[in-house]
From Swiss-Prot:
Main location: membrane
Annotated family: Belongs to the UPF0161 family.
Gene Ontology cellular component terms for the protein in this record: plasma membrane
Identification of the protein by name: Putative membrane protein insertion efficiency factor
């Protein structure tokens, strides 16, 4: 790219969509969720998962991941720890497993 030339604004619509979606999620988190009380079976909560998924994967894939997570959040599912999958440029997060511990005797 030559000096003085601007990059095309192809990412702007996705950034605006991400900001809008995260803004709506924040309204839910701070305005509605406290009135309903804790209901999510997972950690992080479904709304926080959605925010993180949008931040890591963008608005389209992030919304898809959030929708899949919300569908799993029901009384028949045990819940538990369910982190957002790593993005294309992230190293996978290591969840707490007992593989590191020596075998018990």
């Amino acid at each position: 790219m030559r000096p003085g030339k601007r990059r095309p604004l192809t990412r702007l619509p996705f950034a605006l969509l991400s900001w809008g979606m995260i803004g709506l999620l924040r309204v839910y988190q701070y305005g509605i969720s406290p009135l309903l009380g804790p209901r999510c079976r997972f950690w992080p909560s479904c709304s926080q998962y959605a925010v993180e998924a949008i931040q890591v994967h963008g608005p389209l894939k992030g919304a898809w991941l959030a929708l899949k997570r919300i569908v799993k959040c029901h009384p028949g599912h045990p819940g538990g720890v369910d982190p957002v999958p790593p993005g294309p440029h992230e190293t996978p997060r290591k969840t707490s497993t007992h593989d590191d511990e020596p075998p018990s005797r």
